[in-house]
Structures are given as C-alpha cells and as structure tokens.
C-alpha cells in the first residue's frame, strides 16, 4: 500500500535439495557460474538461490571452525592450569600430594597438544613416506 515492495519469505529446501547442495559443498565450497546453472536446473531452484545457499553454508562452516578453535584454546588453558596445580602441589621429594608417595612423572607435566584439533597443520605421511600437506577434514 505505501509503495514498498514486500519482502520474500524464507526459502525452505526439500531434503533432496539440501542433500544435493551439501554433497556439492563437500567437494567445492565455491561454484563456477556454469556449475551453479547446472545445479539450479537439476534442483529446480534459481541461480540466486544456489549462490545464497553457498554463501550461507560457507559462513556456517566458518562459525563451526571458530567454535572448534575456541574449544581447543579452552582445553589448552584448562590443561595448563591442571599442570600448574600439579606442579604447585608436588612436594620437594618429587611425590604428588602430602605423604602419598606417588612419584611425579615429568612427562605428565609436558603439554600434550596432540589432543587438540589442528586446523592449519593436518599433515599425513603418504605410503612412500613423504609428507602430504593436503588439508584433511576435521569433522
């Protein structure tokens, strides 16, 4: 009535469309225009819908990776705090606690970063013993 165009409602995708879009995203986070046209035609969606779905999916992935990083940082801080408590509660004779008599193992005090998920340094050895630096999935 006041001359403003009405905003479109939220797009809902069928399970099949979502599955196909997720499969494509698994292999490619970015689409060429040609591939976007192909997918739009195959799923009976517009190019714009495909483009926006991929933009939203990339933002979702970015948010998930940020959450994983925060969890790892918190785990590292918690581990360092525990190690500090162990160090400060150990007595002069190298045992943990008062009169417990359990020898303190120095290897327990070292940071164990292998429990953290590394986002940047996921490397694996290939069968020939060379390092393969291709990124591996963390999920």
Curated annotation (Swiss-Prot):
Transmembrane segments: none annotated. GO terms for biological process: anterior/posterior pattern specification; negative regulation of transcription by RNA polymerase II. One of its GO terms (cellular component) is nucleus. It comes from Artemia franciscana (Brine shrimp). Coiled coil: none annotated. Required for segmental identity of the second through eighth abdominal segments. Once a pattern of abdA expression is turned on in a given parasegment, it remains on the more posterior parasegment, so that the complex pattern of expression is built up in the successive parasegments. The abdA product appears to repress expression of Ubx whenever they appear in the same cell, but abdA is repressed by AbdB only in the eight and ninth abdominal segments. This is Homeobox protein abdominal-A homolog. Residues 6-65 bind DNA. Keywords: Developmental protein, DNA-binding, Homeobox, Nucleus. Residues 73-86, 125-139 have a biased composition (Basic and acidic residues). GO terms for molecular function: DNA-binding transcription factor activity, RNA polymerase II-specific; RNA polymerase II cis-regulatory region sequence-specific DNA binding. InterPro entries: Abdominal-A (IPR022132), Antp_homeobox (IPR050296), HD (IPR001356), HD_metazoa (IPR020479), Homeobox_CS (IPR017970), Homeodomain-like_sf (IPR009057). The lineage of its organism: Eukaryota, Metazoa, Ecdysozoa, Arthropoda, Crustacea. It is found in: Nucleus. PROSITE patterns: HOMEOBOX_1, HOMEOBOX_2. Residues 73-99, 119-139 are annotated as: Disordered. Belongs to the Antp homeobox family.
